[in-house]
């Protein structure tokens, strides 16, 4: 709603406008170079003014969010307070135009708000250092919005199926132990693949706003066609601006696929593109090529992504429940898109969702202490041959940068103590060198390996000094703009280099399984294709401009409650179709230098200890050739030596204790020097790109 077009330039500010939030807390915290309050942004706009007698009111509702703590379904967090409801009702009765500003990091209660008859509802998210200015620019018509929701907003929290199995406060004691390891609260993914629009659309449940919802001051028309040939779905969409207002539009592609014998979503989002700024009458043709794997489903019985036989409807539009079929094609037989390895197999069958979309109440239970772990007994860590000892002229890391074939000889020069040193991140408490960097890698004057620093940074270079503060990742996802994600990565790289940072601990690619996850702003979306695509473009922007990116957190880091031990019970089809598909898609587009594992165990094993995950899947199937690090302090619950044996290359943040632990493990033959050499080789392959 453009205020100047409807009621002049005067506005009244109500609600939490003085608490306007621009950032989450934790890993995605920004420390902006500068920012404006909402009143300052109004004054600076020159187009609007604050007036007690205005006919238009902006009512601000603010909610914080971030790392270490999930949000709760209580008044003042997910739900509106009684005071907020009373003030909203009063404003709706008093003002001709009521515009509600949702300055929240996650979706909140919408039932009451929808009943107010507000002129407009705007979600700002945590919009970075220019958030208040951007909001006012949109309201006064200086900027034409073109975003779409990257998540479905339910009317009520308990409308979402994962609400029944998010934080299981009735079962938060360890369910079993294995050699002293503690597994915390059980988290049963009974909703399976029915997350977000996949649930609401498939079972025709009412939602406040669907995935893909978005408004603009422009009016666009889209003419589309599609073809399916040689495993590629090609969609051509001609977008025309039929209005006087220049604007951008995004085209979203979905496929309605046969459901087969298992409960599966009605349709799948599988591709998108965004136009340039189109003036009145201008048109642009977008071509969207979608690999068939992106609308396939996983069959754990044959360990493959398949397309079931039957009719496929190709659909184009925006909001998931308001899209149109543009063509159909029929497969006479099942098609195997890709054979895979099996990882993280569940110990018992998940009971799942019934035919009406109800999450069953007879929860899956792991009843035997060793059952989940026994499933993984077949997984073995790889063995390596020790490198022949090099006896020529000393080789430095700079020599390896010039000639990568010298890598083996270079690493063979490392002593056992040096190998152990490079397996442990040398810095903790986010203060190496007092810069606020998250950590630093080991260095060696003898081998000419410099000290390299890393920092958090999905939306800023997170240090003890001001840097550019971008909007949070869930807001970036709402742009549906690949090139913009790349540009964010580029600027993060430029500022990282200015501040002596070589490795960015982002982007984060965990899904919005539940809207109350504390790290909701830090992750992109409820959809794996959108998330995987944007994180790949952001990572490319970082690395093509000289800073290493880190895909995190592998796998299913979907809650902060007991995050180092909360035990996810997830069937393999769901893992492959949702929580692994994010990374699968990202790796198909860009392979970064680093991967960070998640804290949480999944199906009886911690990801940093899971050799099948780190080797068979990550390295062999996905082609990753960088190094794997734990999340900070994963060794509080996971086993450090098992992690290194399984293929984890770097323990973070690390300490002398872990250095000594590795040396003792070598003496006890729990880990070989050859395995450490292989691990350090993976790290050095990445470091040569930083010097």
Annotated model-derived regions:
Residues 4-300, 306-322, 337-691:
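Glycoside hydrolase catalytic-domain context in secreted enzymes
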Residues 328-338:
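Short beta-strand edge segments in extracellular beta-sheet folds
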Residues 323-327:
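Extracellular and select intracellular beta-sandwich modules with Ser/Thr-enriched
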């Amino acid at each position: 709603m453009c205020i100047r077009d409807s009621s002049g330039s005067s506005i009244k500010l109500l609600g939490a406008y003085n608490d306007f939030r621009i950032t989450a807390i934790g890993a995605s915290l920004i420390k902006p170079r500068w920012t404006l309050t909402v009143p300052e942004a109004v004054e600076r706009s020159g187009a609007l003014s604050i007036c007690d007698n205005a006919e238009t009111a902006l009512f601000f509702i603010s909610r914080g969010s971030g790392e270490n703590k999930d949000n709760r379904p209580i008044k003042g967090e997910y739900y509106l307070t009684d005071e907020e409801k009373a003030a909203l009702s009063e404003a709706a009765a008093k003002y001709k135009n009521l515009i509600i500003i949702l300055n929240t990091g996650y979706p909140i209660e919408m039932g009451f708000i929808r009943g107010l008859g507000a002129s407009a509802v705007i979600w700002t998210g945590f919009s970075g250092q220019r958030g208040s200015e951007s909001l006012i620019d949109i309201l006064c018509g200086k900027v034409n919005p073109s975003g779409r929701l990257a998540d479905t907003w339910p009317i009520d929290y308990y409308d979402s199926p994962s609400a029944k199995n998010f934080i299981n406060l009735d079962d938060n004691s360890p369910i079993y132990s294995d050699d002293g390891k503690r597994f915390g609260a059980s988290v049963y993914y009974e909703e399976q693949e029915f997350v977000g629009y996949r649930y609401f659309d498939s079972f025709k449940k009412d939602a406040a706003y669907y995935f893909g919802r978005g408004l603009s001051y422009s009016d666009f028309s889209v003419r589309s066609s599609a073809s399916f040939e040689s495993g590629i779905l090609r969609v051509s969409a001609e977008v025309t601006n039929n209005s006087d207002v220049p604007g951008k539009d995004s085209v979203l592609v979905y496929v309605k696929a046969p459901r087969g014998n298992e409960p599966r979503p009605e349709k799948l989002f599988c591709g998108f593109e965004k136009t340039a700024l189109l003036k009145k009458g201008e048109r642009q043709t977008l071509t969207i090529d979608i690999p068939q794997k992106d609308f396939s489903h996983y069959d754990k019985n044959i360990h493959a992504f398949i397309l079931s036989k039957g009719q496929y409807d190709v659909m184009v539009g925006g909001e998931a429940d308001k899209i149109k079929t543009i063509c159909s094609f029929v497969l006479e037989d099942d098609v195997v898109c890709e054979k895979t390895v099996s990882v993280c197999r569940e110990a018992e069958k998940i009971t799942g969702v019934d035919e009406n979309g109800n999450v069953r109440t007879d929860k899956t239970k792991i009843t035997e202490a060793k059952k989940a772990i026994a499933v993984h007994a077949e997984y073995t860590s790889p063995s390596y041959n020790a490198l022949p000892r090099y006896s020529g002229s000393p080789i430095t890391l700079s020599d390896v940068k010039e000639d990568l074939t010298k890598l083996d000889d270079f690493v063979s020069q490392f002593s056992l103590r040096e190998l152990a040193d490079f397996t442990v991140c040398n810095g903790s408490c986010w203060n190496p060198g007092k810069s606020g960097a998250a950590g630093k890698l080991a260095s060696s004057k003898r081998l000419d390996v410099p000290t390299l620093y890393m920092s958090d940074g999905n939306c800023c270079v997170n240090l003890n000094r001001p840097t550019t503060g971008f909007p949070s990742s869930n807001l970036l996802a709402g742009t549906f703009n690949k090139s913009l994600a790349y540009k964010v990565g580029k600027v993060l790289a430029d500022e990282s280099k200015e501040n002596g940072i070589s490795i960015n601990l982002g982007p984060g690619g965990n899904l919005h399984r539940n809207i109350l996850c504390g790290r909701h702003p830090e992750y992109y979306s409820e959809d794996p294709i959108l998330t995987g695509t944007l994180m790949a473009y952001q990572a490319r922007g970082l690395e093509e401009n000289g800073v290493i990116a880190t895909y995190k957190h592998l796998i299913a880091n979907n809650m902060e409650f007991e995050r180092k031990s909360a035990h996810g019970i997830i069937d393999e089809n769901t893992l492959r179709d949702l929580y692994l598909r994010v990374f699968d898609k990202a790796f198909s587009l860009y392979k970064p230098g680093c991967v960070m594992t998640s804290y949480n165990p999944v199906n009886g094993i911690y990801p940093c200890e899971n050799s099948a995950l780190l080797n068979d899947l990550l390295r062999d199937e996905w082609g990753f050739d960088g190094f794997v690090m734990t999340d900070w302090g994963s060794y509080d619950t996971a086993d450090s030596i098992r992690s290194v044996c399984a293929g984890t290359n770097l323990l973070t943040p690390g300490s002398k204790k872990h250095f000594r632990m590795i040396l003792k493990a070598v003496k006890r033959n729990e880990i070989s020097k050859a395995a450490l050499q292989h691990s350090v080789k993976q790290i050095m392959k990445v470091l040569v790109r930083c010097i």
